[in-house]
Amino acid sequence: MSLNIEDKKAVVAEVSAQLAEAQTLVIAEYRGIEVSSMTKLRAQARENGVYLRVLKNTLVRRAVEGTPFAGLADQMVGPLVYAVSADPVAAAKVLHQFAKADDKIIVKAGSYDGQVLNAAQVAELASIPSREELLSKLLYVMQAPVAGFARALAALAEKQAEAA
């Protein structure tokens, strides 16, 4: 089903709005993927705050013009799924993890911070912990000495109470 010009303009505007707020765009090729698998991919993307769409490449090329993602335009060939996220690693993580489980999805390229990334670089980006994971690790590292000191004081107080 082809879109009329107004629908195409609306799609380009929607994608442009998503790209304006995004830090990362990852593209992956899909061939012969089952509907149930694509539905699972869409659900995982939604859970992780990733905007995921299958679009005409010409429409996406128009949407990326003048954005930091313009360098990906020459990679937009074939049946592609586009993952866009404001989180620097979420889009890469979702597509990379899904590609490991389903060989019909192949991560082709990505763009982060104005740089075009090849598939290996997208895999590296996907291996970086998310901001929330890093903050929780930092909090644990900061709390561990204080918690240990509190336990030592409690044990000392308990020992003195037994002695008295």
Curated annotation (Swiss-Prot):
The keyword Mitochondrion does not apply. CDD domains: Ribosomal_L10 (cd05797). One of its GO terms (cellular component) is ribonucleoprotein complex. Gene3D superfamilies: 3.30.70.1730, 6.10.250.290. One of its GO terms (biological process) is translation. InterPro entries: Ribosomal_uL10, Ribosomal_uL10-like_sf, Ribosomal_uL10_bac, Ribosomal_uL10_bac_type. GO terms for molecular function: large ribosomal subunit rRNA binding. Belongs to the universal ribosomal protein uL10 family. Forms part of the ribosomal stalk, playing a central role in the interaction of the ribosome with GTP-bound translation factors. This is Large ribosomal subunit protein uL10. The gene is rplJ.
